[in-house]
Amino acid sequence: MVPHLITALSGPLLELESKVLEATPTIERWFRLEWQEHTPPFYCSVDLRNSGFKLAPVDTNLFPGGFNNLSPQMLPLAVQAAMAAIEKICPEAKNLLLIPERHTRNTFYLQNIARLSSILRQAGLNVRLGTFSEEIKKPTWIELPDGNRLLMEPLSRLGLKDFDPCSILLNNDLSAGIPPILENLHEQYLLPGLHAGWHIRRKSNHFAAYEEVAKKFAKVVDIDPWMINPYFTSCSNVNFHERKGEEELQTSVEQILKKTAKKYREYGIKDKPYVVVKADAGTYGMGIMVVNDPSQLKDLNRKDRNKMSVVKEGLAVSDVLIQEGVYTFEKVNEAVAEPVVYMIDRYVIGGFYRVHTDRGPDENLNAPGMHFVPLAFEQNSIPDLGAKPGSAPPNRFYLYGVVARLALLAASLELERSDPNAEVTGVPPFAVIVSNVFCCEVSV
């Protein structure tokens, strides 16, 4: 059963909530059967938007970087989920190498690494941190704002008698491409596989897989799949600086706006449809633009064109996703908020609200100035099937967990289809086997 998260929020009645609660036994059995056919990624986070009339994922991250924003109350469940994930991949695992992002000066991100390391250690693993950062030439202690510290070590293909990791866990999304040290490897499990990195992965492929999952799930609970699935399309060969692909992009935006407007009329929704144009690869809230009218794309200023042309690690944008905008009508202390749900293996382990005091309900909240409000578990709570719809927080967050798991299942399908090692028998999906003992350069 998905854990239930505490929140002081209340919202409009969702028909979806009622139908999901009524179908809870069927839904849980459906997920159980799906996980017999598909293997979930080792971990994942999903950004959700709740407009009151629609609840949908807008981003799925296969290298989640906010474990430090989760409530400490979720740690026991996270540890259990990590144990289950590791047991499936490498039951005899003793050592694990964790590879974070290059940026060693972002202490907020490093607090995420500290929390993730703690979870893995409590799951029974000896964890060491290896980095690609050129700044780290030798084992280096990094002090964190909360008083903890991390030992970061340079990576090298060097066998150590006291550290032979069974698995290597990436918390680096490979936006800059595959480092040479990770190429042509065998024998150890690399989680997730290299094909999960942004040098290969595309959001449009994920949402195509999600559309399949949403349609299948909608039949199970008898709902319109649009209630949980944002319309989308994609454009290739776009160059914002040179204004290449501009007409095709405008046409795509217009198509999504028209489809969304038709649904709004069908359900009597008075809000104005909008779309979000975002880089088809990349993360960190970069390369994102809200569009209410296709004509806006003709009048982009230099600042907007620069913003849309390059994302993390200087990755140039040529492919874009055009996604139906989903309003968020949730608030924390009167500030606009959106839930982010975290999972390890197939289990929801917690979540938090991303909050932005200077943004509106139709804007991207993953931007400078955001802050996070952890969601804690409500003790001894299960969905209250007799409660008035929309009135019980456990019911609302059970629903969030269901939709997040649909996105997780979509990620499974997405990675299966892009896995270059799919034909290799005996290899757990989404794990790449690597050779040579791959560990940090110097023993601790």
Regions found by a protein language model. Give the residues of each.
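Conserved hydrophobic helix-helix packing surfaces used for dimerization/oligomerization
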Residues: 95-98, 168, 275
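Conserved N-proximal alpha/beta basic substrate-recognition cap immediately N-terminal to
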Residues: 77-81, 104-271
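Conserved metal-phosphate-binding beta-hairpin within the catalytic cores
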Residues: 38-64, 278, 325, 337-346, ...
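Conserved catalytic alpha/beta cores of large enzymes that bind or transform nucleotide phosphates
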Residues: 86-103, 368-427
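Phosphate-binding site of ATP-dependent enzymes
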Residues: 54, 252-262, 267-274, 281-288, ...
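Low-complexity, highly charged intrinsically disordered N-terminal segments
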Residues: 1-28, 38, 44-45, 51, ...
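Short, flexible loop/turn elements at secondary-structure junctions
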Residues: 47-52, 62-64, 102, 154-156, ...
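Short Pro/Gly-enriched beta-strand edge/turn motifs at strand-loop
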Residues: 26-36, 318-326
